[in-house]
Regions:
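Single conserved hydrophobic/aromatic residue that forms the stacking wall/gate
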Residues: 1-5, 9
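Short, low-complexity disordered leader/linker segments with a strong preference
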Residues: 213-239
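Ligand-binding "clamshell"
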Residues: 31-43, 56-58, 130, 135, ...
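Short amphipathic alpha-helical coupling segments at ligand-binding clamshell hinges
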Residues: 66-68, 177-188
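A conserved helix-loop-strand patch within extracytoplasmic ligand-binding domains
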Residues: 43-92, 195
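A bilobed periplasmic-binding-protein/Venus flytrap-type ligand-binding module shared by bacterial periplasmic
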Residues: 50-61, 166-180
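Alpha-to-beta junction loops
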Residues: 14-24, 68, 91, 112-115, ...
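Periplasmic-binding protein-like
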Residues: 80-87, 189-209
């Protein structure tokens, strides 16, 4: 969708002309709410579009050598996702807290002295014959003739920071979260039938989001809170 079209669709949900929309991630939704004064909320996480590491002159990550070059997108969000993926695969280490705003200046450890070549996202795939590896999002990988499912050497998983942040969601107007129609829509888009369709149709460029990733994160937070509460209770008992 164009930015103008997506704005229209969000306003139609706000006005009640539409019940829901499904084409955006939460940071985009939150930004729109803040800017436009709307009241849209997320009711279901459906899919994400993973970044992947693809072969250039090297065909496997085990072939990485000292001084190799890896091409990544140069815009803020996409570069951060690329760097996080490289970190997840042991190629670099980023400074603590760099997260989804990371840049090459946040690289804390680079044991192979890898050179990061920053390019416009649409240019990255074109330099594959000249660099060891390229890091691409799904649509540019498909445009370059890669099969995301077959050719990516590594890709973002549902439990990655990027996937949990940039998962595409169903959005509704606040107050309509418990509507039976909305619940049915969410259940349908989370069904095994839809997951199978996504997997078959998009060849890995779009991946169904697994709610277990969020559940695991919630469990960790709950465990922390429980531990803190137990500690306070123990201290009070001791007093």
């Amino acid at each position: 969708y164009s930015s103008a079209a997506s704005d229209v669709y969000k306003r139609q949900v706000e006005s009640g002309e539409m019940d829901a929309n499904y084409f955006q991630h939460v940071p985009y939704l939150d930004s729109f709410n803040e800017e436009k004064g709307t009241h849209l909320v997320e009711v279901g996480k459906i899919h994400y579009e993973p970044f992947g590491i693809y072969p250039g002159t090297k065909k496997d990550l085990s072939e990485l050598a000292d001084g190799d070059t890896i091409a990544v997108p140069n815009d803020t969000t996409n570069e951060a996702r690329a760097l996080l993926l490289l970190q997840d695969n042991g190629i670099i280490t980023l400074k603590d807290g760099a997260g989804l705003e990371a840049t090459v200046n946040d690289i804390a450890e680079n044991p192979h002295n890898v050179k990061i070549e920053e390019l416009a996202a649409e240019q990255v795939a074109r330099v594959a014959p000249e660099v060891a590896f390229v890091v691409l999002n799904g649509n540019y990988a498909l445009q370059a003739g890669y099969s995301v499912a077959q050719d990516s050497l590594a890709y973002e998983t549902s439990d990655s920071e990027a996937a949990k942040t940039y998962v595409n969601v169903i959005a509704v107007k606040e107050g309509n979260e418990e509507s039976e129609a909305i619940k049915a829509l969410v259940d349908t888009l989370k069904s095994d039938e839809i997951k199978d369709f996504i997997n078959e149709k998009y060849d890995g460029a779009v991946i169904p989001f697994e709610d277990s990733a969020d559940a695991d994160a919630d469990k960790e937070e709950t465990a922390d809170v429980t531990t803190d509460t137990e500690t306070e209770t123990t201290e009070e008992a001791a007093e």
